[in-house]
């Protein structure tokens, strides 16, 4: 098995491995997989790296070392050591070998199908288990589905990756049977209570649906029944409970935006306030991996990360680290979307899929969200090329 195929197969394990991450004896499982993937990525990218990316990777090492120097140990979250570098390596790989990456996903149809089936069986069975549901008092005491993960924000990224893989399978094979596998992850979106992931999941479906509709007026007409259907489903699901719990009233603890964002805007304000008090070198290269946790710990009973990619990376790796992150996302979008001259609506939807997650939840710290984003871009590109080819015949 060559390194590209090995990388493809390792990446596809994340949605299944993540399900078991909360098990006491398996807490290490995702971290071990992530380290293996990083080793393979380093092997693949360092061999034939463009000078531009070599300079960027060197800078990433510099900001990482500086962040470690600024960190007061022990770490609140040891995973933070890996996320940022992993994302940059992933970006370098996909932008350097776009055709190679696409070909290996095509060749692994059966493997992808087995991963989707295994995830669907595990999560599907858990739907009927009372232990898969939790009462969250912070979210209005609603009953939320977490499957065997124990956490809605651990389950939701796996749902997103499965939806991406299912749509990717359909785009690459044109076999409609794969679309039935969307049902369980959509149930997960509706019942886990994450408004961000529910919205992102719907945007992913809309992006593929827009390309599918050859006559675009059909797409816009179809939005009417789809909006009505989703409205009914949301109002009668845990998502509706979460929306009701985060609706601002005169009795709300936070202000309007604080209530809507579950207090995130309060953390953001504190994080930025203390970041701008740092010296210019720390602002350029970052304040360390614990900076955001230490700030919230000082003012609240628990330490929290920023829940925002831009602020988190700014605090950890400074202006330079944030600039590299934004450039890496642009590089991916340019390679798979912008250079293909895709319709403006598709470009907008893809941008919002990344931006909403990065802004209101965090994108680069959820492995399944990170891993499935380039896969979604590959599937959209291949499907768009296929539809354009048919239209030109």
Where are these regions (language model features)?
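A juxtamembrane structural motif centered on a specific transmembrane helix
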Residues: 1-6, 45-49, 173, 338-342, ...
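N-terminal signal-anchor transmembrane segment
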Residues: 1-47, 62-74, 126-132, 354
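Alpha-helical transmembrane segments of multi-pass inner-membrane proteins
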Residues: 109-136, 150-211
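Long extracytoplasmic/lumenal interhelical loops at the membrane interface
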Residues: 258-317
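Flexible juxtamembrane loops connecting transmembrane helices in multi-pass membrane enzymes
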Residues: 233-269, 294
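Aromatic-anchored transmembrane helix interface
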Residues: 34, 54-68, 75-100, 114-120
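Transmembrane alpha-helices of multi-pass inner-membrane enzymes
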Residues: 346-357, 363-393
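Hydrophobic transmembrane alpha-helices and their immediate junctions
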Residues: 45-51, 176, 217-219, 223, ...
